[in-house]
Amino acid sequence: MKRVKLTAIIQKEGRGFVALCPELDIASQGTSKKQARGNLQEAVEGFFETASAAEIKTRLGTERYIENLEVRLA
């Protein structure tokens, strides 16, 4: 089975956490960071189990760049 490394961006939002996989544009949430990550992993695995080969190729083939920005605060 082929494996691919993807990005998980997890941030606190209100009383919970939101997790995003930007490569696939899939998000999930949870009450803890660990739960949000686990839920995201389940969502991503579900996507790969159900999506067509064309949809997978389209999402993984899109160029995305994650970079840090430094801005001045007023």
Q: PLM features: residue spans?
A:
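A short, exposed loop/beta-hairpin motif centered on an aromatic-Gly-Thr core
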Residues: 24-33
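Short, charged, surface-exposed hinge/linker loops at domain edges
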Residues: 1-5, 9, 34, 38-74
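Short aromatic-glycine-(Arg/Gly/Cys) micro-motifs in beta-strand/loop hairpins
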Residues: 4-21
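Compositionally biased, intrinsically disordered low-complexity regions
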Residues: 16-18, 32, 63
